[in-house]
């Protein structure tokens, strides 16, 4: 199952690279990137892909092929997912001088690179299955631009449970379904009193209900002040809504993969109810975010990149993905 779920990270990586190659990302305004960081953002992601080829030609081939065949509607989705999460992170970082980020199920995500350069008091922890972080560790150390940006040595010198333990950045292996292992790891790499951002980006949808709820409850009780940012698909709650059923069928047929809670938390309200212990919970679908949070000047920029004639398809897709922010 770990290996199957890791394949979904390659999907996310190919989508991110496709959006970058066409110019959807980076969004220097919404991601608050300087000219220099915008240039580095592109270089970091391209270097990650090139270096991936050294360790897995098969994975590189899949990512490269998918990247080149991405449609505008997919690029819009990746753009919204990325800037939506980044905007939530940035809002919390600006409001709190010292912050730690815990990225659950980090995969190949490189969000830590610009954030660590932008915020000198930020600490960042990436956590995922062993196989995923082993590959990420190898790529980060092998690529010169990635290695230098994180201040790493080419040799792996970190001590268990970390693969990377370098200043303000840590990379660690953990099965997040095992709450004992997860708690033990957080005990050694985070501090309770520091304001904490928890990111779960397409993670909880692959976990069973009991395990995911225990993870949420345990982590929220562990930190005195925090912001949980979660991005996931929802199955849809309208009588004639077939989105969730079709998604489940496609995943089962193509990957033998399940999303156990896709239909359990099939609406924004049901999804957000998992964070009922938090006093401040905001949940939006990505279509709402597109219409309410993306300024017209930015939408004009997006329209100049590619012609999008599947506006109704974009609406259907993005109303079935949500961004939830729970603050306590």
Swiss-Prot record:
Stretch forming the signal peptide: none
Disulfide bonding pattern of the chain: none
Keywords from the named record: Methyltransferase, S-adenosyl-L-methionine, Transferase
Family matches, as InterPro entries: LCMT1, Ppm1/Ppm2/Tcmp, SAM-dependent_MTases_sf
Activity regulation field: Inhibited by S-adenosyl-L-homocysteine.
BP terms from Gene Ontology: methylation; protein-containing complex assembly; regulation of autophagy
Reactions catalysed, as given in the entry: [phosphatase 2A protein]-C-terminal L-leucine + S-adenosyl-L-methionine = [phosphatase 2A protein]-C-terminal L-leucine methyl ester + S-adenosyl-L-homocysteine
UniProt cross-references to Pfam families, sorted A to Z: LCM (PF04072)
Entry superkingdom: Eukaryota
Residues bound to S-adenosyl-L-methionine: 81, 105, 128, 175-177, 201
EC number: 2.1.1.233
Entry's Gene Ontology molecular function annotations: protein C-terminal leucine carboxyl O-methyltransferase activity
Function: Methylates the carboxyl group of the C-terminal leucine residue of protein phosphatase 2A catalytic subunits to form alpha-leucine ester residues. Acts on the two major protein phosphatase 2A catalytic subunits, PPH21 and PPH22.
Family named by the database record: Belongs to the methyltransferase superfamily. LCMT family.
Name this protein carries in UniProt: Leucine carboxyl methyltransferase 1
Organism the protein comes from: Saccharomyces cerevisiae (strain ATCC 204508 / S288c)
């Amino acid at each position: 199952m770990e290996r199957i779920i890791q394949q979904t990270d390659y999907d996310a990586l190919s989508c991110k690279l496709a959006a970058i190659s066409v110019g959807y990302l980076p969004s220097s305004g919404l991601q608050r990137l300087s000219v220099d960081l915008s240039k580095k953002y592109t270089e970091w992601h391209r270097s990650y892909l090139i270096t991936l080829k050294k360790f897995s030609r098969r994975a590189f081939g899949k990512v490269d092929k998918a990247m080149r065949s991405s449609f505008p509607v997919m690029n819009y989705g990746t753009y919204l997912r990325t800037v939506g999460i980044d905007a939530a992170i940035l809002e919390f970082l600006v409001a709190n001088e010292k912050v730690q980020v815990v990225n659950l199920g980090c995969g190949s995500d490189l969000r830590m690179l610009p954030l660590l350069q932008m915020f000198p008091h930020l600490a960042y922890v990436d956590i995922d299955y062993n196989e995923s972080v082993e590959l990420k560790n190898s790529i980060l150390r092998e690529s010169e631009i990635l290695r230098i940006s994180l201040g790493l040595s080419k040799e792996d010198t970190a001590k268990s449970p970390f693969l990377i333990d370098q200043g303000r950045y840590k990379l660690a292996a953990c099965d997040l379904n095992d709450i004992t292992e997860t708690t033990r790891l957080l005990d050694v790499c985070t501090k309770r009193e520091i304001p904490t951002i928890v990111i779960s980006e397409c993670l909880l949808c692959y976990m069973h209900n009991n395990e995911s709820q225990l993870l949420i409850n345990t982590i929220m009780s562990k930190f005195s002040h925090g912001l949980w940012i979660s991005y996931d698909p929802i199955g849809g709650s309208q009588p004639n809504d077939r989105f969730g059923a079709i998604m489940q069928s496609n995943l089962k047929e193509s990957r033998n993969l399940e999303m156990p809670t896709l239909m359990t938390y099939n609406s924004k309200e049901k999804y957000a109810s998992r964070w009922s212990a938090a006093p401040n919970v905001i949940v939006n679908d990505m279509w709402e975010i597109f219409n309410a949070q993306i300024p017209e000047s930015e939408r004009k920029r997006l329209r100049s990149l590619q012609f999008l004639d599947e506006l109704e398809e974009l609406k259907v897709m993005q109303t079935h993905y949500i961004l939830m922010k729970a603050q306590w």
